[in-house]
Amino acid sequence: MEAALLVEKNLNQALLDLHGLASARGDPHICDFLENHFLDEEV
């Protein structure tokens, strides 16, 4: 169980890093795709 949480945390961080890179490079299509399919807002 702990390993699964670590994998999920690492994957989420990689997606956030990718989103940051796409944002810095001015690629709204990748940003939108990541936001709509992977980066749900958490309450």
From Swiss-Prot:
Keywords: Cytoplasm, Cytoplasmic vesicle, Iron, Iron storage, Lysosome, Metal-binding. The keyword Membrane does not apply. It is found in: Cytoplasmic vesicle, Autophagosome; Cytoplasm; Autolysosome. Residues 1-43 form the Ferritin-like diiron domain. Gene3D superfamilies: 1.20.1260.10. Pfam families: Ferritin. GO terms for biological process: intracellular iron ion homeostasis; iron ion transport. GO terms for molecular function: ferric iron binding; ferrous iron binding; iron ion binding. One of its GO terms (cellular component) is autophagosome. InterPro entries: Ferritin (IPR001519), Ferritin-like (IPR012347), Ferritin-like_diiron (IPR009040), Ferritin-like_SF (IPR009078), Ferritin_DPS_dom (IPR008331). Stores iron in a soluble, non-toxic, readily available form. Important for iron homeostasis. Iron is taken up in the ferrous form and deposited as ferric hydroxides after oxidation. Also plays a role in delivery of iron to cells. Mediates iron uptake in capsule cells of the developing kidney. Delivery to lysosomes by the cargo receptor NCOA4 for autophagic degradation and release or iron. Belongs to the ferritin family. Oligomer of 24 subunits. There are two types of subunits: L (light) chain and H (heavy) chain. The major chain can be light or heavy, depending on the species and tissue type. The functional molecule forms a roughly spherical shell with a diameter of 12 nm and contains a central cavity into which the insoluble mineral iron core is deposited. Interacts with NCOA4. This is Ferritin light chain. It comes from Ovis aries.
